[in-house]
Structures are given as C-alpha cells and as structure tokens.
Design a protein with these regions (language model features):
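Functionally important transmembrane alpha-helices
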Residues: 187-219
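Terminal transmembrane helical anchor/hairpin motif
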Residues: 2-4, 18, 29-30, 63-86, ...
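Aromatic- and glycine-rich beta-strand/loop motifs that create alpha-glucan
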Residues: 2-58
C-alpha cells in the first residue's frame, strides 16, 4: 500500500492562499496600469489648473452653440433642428482647436518634467521608462475623457435649458459622438507624447501641437476627404462636428481601425525612442 501524502501545513505554520488566474490578473492590472498611473498622478504639477481651464473652454464653446441657436431660432424651428445646433456649433472649434491644444499642454507638461536633470536616461538605466510612459499615456487619456465628458454634459444641460426634449436616442447619439471623439483624442495624445519624448523644450512641444491643430483646421476646410486620415482631425471626425450625421457601422469600424493603427504606430515609436535612451 502506498501511504497518502499529507499536503496540509504543519501545525503552527501559516497557510497562504492559493494563487490563481484571478489573483494573477489583478496583480498584472496593478503593476501595468494602477501603479504607473498613481506614480504619474503624484508627479503631476497642479493638474487642477489645466482641468479648470478645460472646463472654461468647454463652457465657452457650448455657449457659442447656444447663442447660435438663439440668433436663428425661427429658422431652426422651421427646420426641426434642436440640440444638433448646440452640438455642431460648439463642437467644431472645440474638436478642431481647443481640445487638441489642451491635450498638447497636458502631454508637454508630463514629458517636460522627465527631461529635467536627464530623468529619461536615468530611468532607462533601471528599466523604468516604459512604466513611466504607460502612466503618462493613461493620465493623458483620462484627461481627454474628462474634457469630453464635460463638453457632453454641458451640451445636455444647455439643451435642457433651451427646452429641447432629449429622447434616449438623442442622448445615445451624443454619447456615441463624444466617445468616438475621445478615441480620436487618444491618437493626438499618443502623438504629442512622442513629440515630447524627442523634444526637451516645453515651448517647442506646445508649438508643434498648436501648429498641427491649425493644420487640421486648414485640411478640414480645403481638403475635407484628407481629414479622415490626418491624426489631429480625428476628434472632429469622431464627434461628427461638421456632418452631424449618424455614423454607419462601417464608418465606425474604419474610424476605430485607423485610429488604432495610428496609436499603435506612435506608441511603438515612443517605446523605441525610450529604449534608445539606454545607450
């Protein structure tokens, strides 16, 4: 007879919980997302200033849409157009210039701090650059989401104040446009972080982003078909700021695929640039 093997812990010895897939996934989430985010939030300098400025710009752009509707109320009523006026007029400049500029300032501030005292190269010596970059990308993503949600809620509030009846379909449409715009904003965030990694000057990084944003406006006016490909036009495309049309499943799929390609390319280039700082 073979004696049974006792796997119980000896008396007086602590029993440790069994690790499994759930614990492993939780630890990976903490290591790859939560920890880098917490570190970058701690390092971030007075983020409330830019957040307040973003809210003020969202208010101004929404007010622009409200005044546009009030100026041509009879015409819009005859056409049966309501909240779309507030959204379209407010989102045009918001998505083309103001949100890309806000993301530019946020990304430039996050990358500039690492150029001080050659922190990028110092972190590269112990393999912390990718973790740091991940935290900055997540933090910029959350900032873009905050900006978009602020604009969305302000348009809803303004529409309600004007007496518009927002149906569930209207709310779903606005939310979809805002989220698609957020996805497009991530493309800009990734691009600006890449610029910030290469360029140590805060002013140069910001001017690059502002120039790219104005070029987006020019492309939108002169060659609208090219705006679907231009990275800094993706917020405008996602928010349907010009067309105010319900996107088809095919157009949404193309938008998501193209922005995923752009983001993947810029993230890979950023990681490559950070690895080169080890040498």
């Amino acid at each position: 007879m073979t004696a049974a093997i006792n796997t119980a812990a000896p008396a007086g010895m602590p029993e440790f919980p069994q690790t499994g897939p759930t614990i492993t996934r939780t630890s990976r989430l903490r290591e790859r997302v939560l920890l880098p985010l917490a570190i970058e939030r701690t390092k971030s300098r007075r983020p409330w200033i830019l957040a307040t400025f973003a809210l003020a710009l969202a208010v101004l752009n929404t007010a622009n849409g409200v005044f546009r509707y009030l100026g041509y109320t009879k015409i819009f009523r005859d056409q049966g157009v309501t909240w779309q006026v507030v959204w379209g007029q407010g989102a045009l400049m918001w998505s083309t210039l103001f949100l890309p500029m806000l993301i530019t300032f946020r990304a430039a501030g996050l990358t500039r701090m690492e150029h001080e005292h050659d922190n990028w190269r110092r972190m590269a010596t112990y393999g912390a650059t990718i973790t740091t970059y991940t935290g900055k990308l997540i933090l910029t993503t959350l900032f873009a989401l905050y900006c978009q949600m602020a604009f969305l809620l302000l348009v809803m509030a303004a529409s309600a104040a004007l007496g518009f009846h927002l149906t569930p379909a209207d709310i779903a449409t606005m939310t979809t446009w805002a989220l698609l715009g957020t996805f497009g904003a991530l493309t800009i965030a990734a691009a600006q972080l890449l610029v910030g990694i290469y360029v140590p000057s805060f002013a140069t990084t910001v001017l690059t982003g502002i120039g790219a944003s104005f070029l987006s406006l020019a492309v939108l006016l002169v060659a609208p078909p090219l705006s679907t490909l231009y990275p800094y036009s993706q917020v405008t495309i996602g928010m349907q700021a010009r067309s105010l049309a319900t996107p088809t499943p095919a157009s949404i799929a193309w938008f998501l695929i193209w922005n995923t390609i752009l983001m993947t390319a810029t993230v890979l280039l950023s990681r490559r640039a950070l690895r080169r700082k080890q040498h």
